[in-house]
Amino acid sequence: VIGGDECNINEHRFL
Protein backbone atom coordinates (compact mmCIF):
# COMPACT_ATOMS: atom_id res chain seq x y z
CA VAL A 1 0.00 0.00 0.00
CA ILE A 2 1.54 3.31 -1.09
CA GLY A 3 0.47 6.48 0.73
CA GLY A 4 3.41 8.48 2.01
CA ASP A 5 6.30 8.58 4.46
CA GLU A 6 3.92 8.33 7.41
CA CYS A 7 2.07 5.40 5.84
CA ASN A 8 5.35 3.63 5.06
CA ILE A 9 6.67 4.15 8.60
CA ASN A 10 3.35 3.00 10.09
CA GLU A 11 3.37 -0.19 8.01
CA HIS A 12 7.01 -0.91 8.87
CA ARG A 13 6.33 -0.28 12.56
CA PHE A 14 3.30 -2.58 12.45
CA LEU A 15 5.32 -5.30 10.77
From Swiss-Prot:
GO terms for molecular function: serine-type peptidase activity; toxin activity. Its main location: secreted. The keyword Transmembrane does not apply. N-glycosylated. Cleavage of N-glycans reduces the catalytic enzymatic efficiency. Keywords: Disulfide bond, Glycoprotein, Hydrolase, Protease, Secreted, Serine protease, Toxin. Residues 1-15 form the Peptidase S1 domain. Its EC number is 3.4.21.-. Inhibited by PMSF, Fe(3+), Fe(2+), Cu(2+), Cd(2+), Mn(2+), and Al(3+). Not inhibited by Ca(2+) and Mg(2+) and EDTA. It is found in: Secreted. One of its GO terms (cellular component) is extracellular region. Expressed by the venom gland. Optimum temperature is 30-40 degrees Celsius. Belongs to the peptidase S1 family. Snake venom subfamily. This is Snake venom serine protease AHP-Ka. It comes from Gloydius halys (Chinese water mocassin).
